[in-house]
Regions:
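Active-site SXXK
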Residues: 96, 110-128, 185, 224-228, ...
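Extracytoplasmic
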Residues: 83-85, 103-105, 111-114, 129-131, ...
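Beta-lactamase-like hydrolase cores
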Residues: 23-44, 58-107, 171-176, 429
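Bacterial Sec-dependent N-terminal signal peptides
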Residues: 1-26
Length: 430
């Protein structure tokens, strides 16, 4: 028995940017299953020596084909198939094979599923024990409770740094017996360059602050620091400046947060500031000071090449997916998810950070059905005209799938989300 299902759609798009590279004309490929439905097997043909593993494999194939057939029907009935650009790919990580693909090589804007690329590249490069660090140092001499020297606040682009951390900074100064500072308070922002907006961001959007020295998400660190010093009774006589910290500066205190703490907020809540902070940690790992977005892009491109794809086929503009210049494919996102799954040092940190269908994050109110709730774990993406979803789910026969669904040119977000939810339901149902 065979299922014949074919659509030939052609979408041509020419993308022109004032600063971006031109993309080739994109063709939407006809829908294609990469699967074969097994023919009916008579009882006479069944060998008495058939093993249980063969039976299990047969059952798994039937379940896979059933899911693919359901996705066929969903796509056939969706107006988005011919009214928008779609990229879809589903890969069986247990059987190591692609089971569904449609337009998987179409170059599309990913929106916040770009955060998956950032997260996987960062964990791969930095490691699961990596710490976001903001440091306090000083130079000069302490005599009679007076510091005749400078205090340096070294920014590490930690989006979680808050008033409690700042209080710890002030307590660190008090612990040295200092009640007066005669010198400068220096804001060391040398971790990254001075870019305030990401490449391809709209200036009038509610964009995250790209400063390596933040307090409660705002670029007001030094003002708050001086206020805390005054409240603690520490006299400051000097100027507030920006500069680089000398290598011989003395340590006062460090405040750190783990990469897991960053990932949880970044992925569950789709927090753009956290994503850009991680993007610049990646950039900083290049050793360049100040680091740039291009440093991060170069590291991501090396990983793309490592997993067997051509990085020149994509554009990586930022870490969050806010940029209108990001262009990836469903195939790329699936390959990244595969790479993460196959490397436990990445997967153990990525998987817990993903929103859980019907439970938390951006999927809390979605897919509240018996087969998808607490099963689908995926990153959502939303921009004007863009809806995307990429992540993992488990089939009734305990196969782990990874998938990516990217939809561009949509007029109604609810319509695209409904399509995503139905596809996930089809993958998770018996």
């Amino acid at each position: 028995m065979k299922i014949f299902f074919a659509f030939i759609l052609a979408f041509f798009a020419s993308f022109h940017y004032s600063q971006a590279q031109a993309l080739d004309e994109t063709h939407v490929e006809p829908y294609c299953h990469i699967h074969t439905i097994p023919p009916s097997i008579s009882s006479e043909a069944i060998s008495s020596k058939a093993t249980s593993s063969e039976a299990t494999s047969s059952e798994a194939t039937v379940l896979t084909e059933s899911a693919a057939s359901r996705v066929d029907s969903i796509l056939a009935s969706s107006p988005l198939l011919y009214k928008s650009s779609l990229g879809l790919m589903v890969y069986d990580l247990t059987d190591n094979k692609t089971i569904i693909s449609y337009g998987e090589k179409n170059t599309l804007r990913p929106a916040s599923t770009m955060k998956l690329v950032t997260a996987i590249a960062a964990i791969d490069r930095l490691g699961g024990s990596y710490l976001f660090r903001t440091s306090l140092r000083y130079t000069g001499e302490i005599k009679d409770n007076v510091l005749n020297g400078d205090v340096y606040c070294i920014g590490g682009f930690d989006p979680r740094f808050n008033s409690d951390d700042l209080t710890a900074f002030v307590e660190g100064i008090r612990s040295l017996g200092i009640d007066t500072i005669r010198g400068c308070l220096v804001a060391d922002k040398m971790m990254k360059n001075e870019d305030r907006l990401g490449w391809g961001w709209c200036w009038d959007d509610d964009n995250p602050v790209l400063s390596p020295l933040l307090i409660s998400r705002k670029d007001e660190f030094m003002q708050h620091f001086v206020s805390e010093l005054v409240d603690a009774g520490i006299v400051f006589i000097g100027n507030i400046i920006e500069g680089d910290t000398p290598i011989d500066a003395y340590e006062i205190v460090d405040r750190t947060h783990t990469i897991d703490q960053i990932l949880m907020k970044m992925m569950k809540d789709s927090d753009n500031l956290y994503a850009e902070a991680l993007f610049y940690q990646l950039a900083s790992s290049s050793g360049n000071r100040p680091a740039t977005a291009q440093d991060a892009r170069n590291i991501i491109k090396r990983l793309i090449r490592k997993i067997g794809l051509n990085p020149s086929d994509y554009i990586f503009a930022d870490g969050s997916g806010l940029s209108l210049y990001n262009y990836v494919t469903a195939e790329l996102e699936v390959e990244m998810l595969k790479y993460a799954y196959q490397n436990s040092n990445i997967y153990l940190h990525l998987y817990p950070s993903l929103p859980i269908a019907g439970i938390d994050g951006t999927l809390k109110r979605r897919m509240k059905t018996p087969f998808t709730t607490d099963n689908v774990r995926a990153k959502t993406g939303t921009l004007t005209g863009v809806q995307s979803l990429a992540g993992y789910c488990t089939t009734p026969n305990n196969h782990t799938l990874c998938f990516a669904i990217i939809n561009n040119g949509i007029l109604k977000d609810s319509q695209a989300r409904s399509l995503q939810d139905k596809i996930c339901e089809a993958l998770c149902s018996p």
